[in-house]
């Protein structure tokens, strides 16, 4: 996987001063970022998150998803721990891109759920490729994670790459009336582990 390290710098945030590592995927031209804090190459499991880019949630305060809230909660958790890593992956819209995500939102406004909308546009429900994470984690010396996620697919992807997931740390945050059925669909159709709150809430056709 031709993902190469480019540069690193300090990144002060309201939570902590992280080190920001920049990587380039030469195959796609996409630029990815890793935020790290503390000694993450000591062989001990590292509190971490794989966070896919979500412009609407991360930067524009959208309540259609829980992404922005999860990003903030993950960075806060790493800051409290004093040690951790967050991979910010440029895989907008579960891998379909920003404009296609807006097209999917338009279909959702008409009644489709998040999975149906992607499929009507000719995409899989989730097109993300987590193989890009391996060279970044190897560069940083991370071999084991306490992974902050509700998505079992991320756990499997890391395990398949021989990155040990020592623990899955749930991230239950950002729930609101606007994303209730979105979260229910992720639980019912994508297998996300969101507890009982959203199980069985997808409206039946």
Curated annotation (Swiss-Prot):
Active site: 126 (proton acceptor), 128 (nucleophile)
InterPro entries tied to this protein: GTP_cyclohydro_II, RibA, RibA-like_sf
The EC number(s) this enzyme carries: 3.5.4.25
Metal-binding in keyword set: yes
Record text on cofactor binding: Binds 1 zinc ion per subunit.
GO function terms (MF aspect): GTP binding; GTP cyclohydrolase II activity; zinc ion binding
Pathways per UniProt: Cofactor biosynthesis; riboflavin biosynthesis; 5-amino-6-(D-ribitylamino)uracil from GTP: step 1/4
Cofactor(s), by name: Zn(2+)
UniProt GO BP: riboflavin biosynthetic process
Broad EC category: hydrolase
Binding-site residues, Zn(2+): 54, 65, 67
Catalytic activity: GTP + 4 H2O = 2,5-diamino-6-hydroxy-4-(5-phosphoribosylamino)-pyrimidine + formate + 2 phosphate + 3 H(+)
A GO cellular component annotation in the UniProt record: cytosol
Alphabetical UniProt keywords: GTP-binding, Hydrolase, Metal-binding, Nucleotide-binding, Riboflavin biosynthesis, Zinc
Entry binding sites for GTP: 49-53, 70, 92-94, 114, 149, 154
Pfam families membership: GTP_cyclohydro2
Family statement: Belongs to the GTP cyclohydrolase II family.
Function: Catalyzes the conversion of GTP to 2,5-diamino-6-ribosylamino-4(3H)-pyrimidinone 5'-phosphate (DARP), formate and pyrophosphate.
Name listed for the protein in its UniProt record: GTP cyclohydrolase-2
The species this protein was found in: Pseudomonas putida (strain W619)
